[in-house]
């Protein structure tokens, strides 16, 4: 029987550090439940000491998840570890993940600590975490640029202190696959007590090598991979969970281990995360991109028709791609609606939330002849973007005529008040945004405006993503409607609501 490769998902922690990808507590719980449904072994829910909001989100995930291990990140200081322990106590399999920097540049310039002092601090942190759980993970931050002799010393010491998982991060995505795999092999060979711990890796994608480095590490003895859905994460992102899992599954002739992931849930999970964060999946993205199983070349099409394995190394249905079939219509009832949401891996928090989305579904069905699974994902994501709206669109009139200056008029609810404004612009969307700004005066900088059609057809639901920046804070707004101008207004207001309710966070780089 093959060894098990532990899949450690950090979408809720490291993935959230993608600029604009902040999530509400309810959104984190929805994603965590889907990760559990997919069979993820460990869910890193966040950094409890970062803020009250992060603490409450980790606590909510720990309470919502029972089969997967829920993990909280903490620096190697007692106060952080205490917050993690408190937030995670509802999860029977809780894990505390503590870290400290070990590269010369970090120890000298950031920590301003000697190597011996760093080892002492790491030992103390692991022992302190063991008061809460035996399931303790330790990471030497920036291991890729750390001296090998020092790494061996500190890892041997934390194993003796009780750490059962050793995570080796390539924090800045600097190493090459052979180099990183060799590092894992060397550590396992040189550390006397290495057999008492599981070696894990956490690779960043700055050079586009996160998945390659992770797989190289697996071939050299790593038995846990830290990854994110769609490769979300700081800067260029992390190793993509779907790529790691399917590489190991597809090449069982090559890898000495396997995962317990239900791969048929991959596409649904990808769409859920994309919808909540507002980060669309690129069409040519491996496994979950819209073109991942498309063949346009005549030669390729002919080969696939004759024998699928000529050009397909895995089946689309194995990762959750199915026929884009007609699903529901305006005569469909609430039970059928609920049943299909459940089949798509979507579980809503309450009957009230179901009723709200069902009403929106009925409105969409009146406008759109065919309702597809993608439409349902968009409706749920649009509704769940933010729990309390400080700004709400009440009405919108946009006018665009050839040879005339586009014009928009909006009415927005701000708290208990209603305000109206109108503006001209270079186009109907620009005019709408300018009218909104006359009311909100957010002074935010528009960094991104993106429109995606959810399904085919001129009556397709349009999905708009807006990215705003204000005083260093970056947020993504999301809106969906058959009217692109209305979807744009919703997305802009959604982003402004996030700016209004944003919380300051500390983002550790592991």
From Swiss-Prot:
What UniProt keywords apply to this chain's record, in alphabetical order?
Amino-acid biosynthesis, Branched-chain amino acid biosynthesis, Cytoplasm, Leucine biosynthesis, Manganese, Metal-binding, Transferase
Which Gene Ontology molecular-function terms are recorded? 2-isopropylmalate synthase activity; acetyl-CoA C-acetyltransferase activity; manganese ion binding
Q: What is its pathway?
A: Amino-acid biosynthesis; L-leucine biosynthesis; L-leucine from 3-methyl-2-oxobutanoate: step 1/4
Q: Name one Pfam family in it.
A: HCS_D2
State the taxonomy lineage: Bacteria, Pseudomonadati, Pseudomonadota, Betaproteobacteria, Nitrosomonadales
Q: Output the Gene3D superfamilies linked to this UniProt entry.
A: 1.10.238.260, 3.30.160.270, Aldolase class I
Q: Which family does it belong to?
A: Belongs to the alpha-IPM synthase/homocitrate synthase family. LeuA type 1 subfamily.
Location (main, coarse)? cytoplasm
Tell me the enzyme class: transferase
Subcellular localization: Cytoplasm
* Protein name as annotated: 2-isopropylmalate synthase
Show the InterPro entries listed in the entry: 2-IPM_HCS-like, 2-isopropylmalate_synth_dimer, AIPM/Hcit_synth_CS, Aldolase_TIM, LeuA/HCS_post-cat, LeuA_allosteric_dom_sf, LeuA_bact_synth, PYR_CT
Fill in the subunit field for this protein: Homodimer.
Concerning HAMAP family, the annotation shows:
LeuA_type1
What EC number(s) has UniProt assigned to this enzyme?
A: 2.3.3.13
What does this gene product do? Catalyzes the condensation of the acetyl group of acetyl-CoA with 3-methyl-2-oxobutanoate (2-ketoisovalerate) to form 3-carboxy-3-hydroxy-4-methylpentanoate (2-isopropylmalate).
Q: Where do the Pyruvate carboxyltransferase domain residues begin and end? A: 5-267
Q: Where is this region: Regulatory domain?
A: 392-510
- GO cellular component terms, semicolon-separated: cytosol
Reaction(s) catalysed by this chain's protein: 3-methyl-2-oxobutanoate + acetyl-CoA + H2O = (2S)-2-isopropylmalate + CoA + H(+)
State the organism of origin.
Answer: Nitrosomonas eutropha (strain DSM 101675 / C91 / Nm57)
Residue sites binding Mn(2+) per the record: 14, 202, 204, 238
| UniProt cross-references to NCBIfam families, sorted A to Z | leuA_bact, PRK00915.1-3, PRK00915.1-4
Q: Name one GO biological process term.
A: L-leucine biosynthetic process
Q: Which cofactor does it need?
A: Mn(2+)
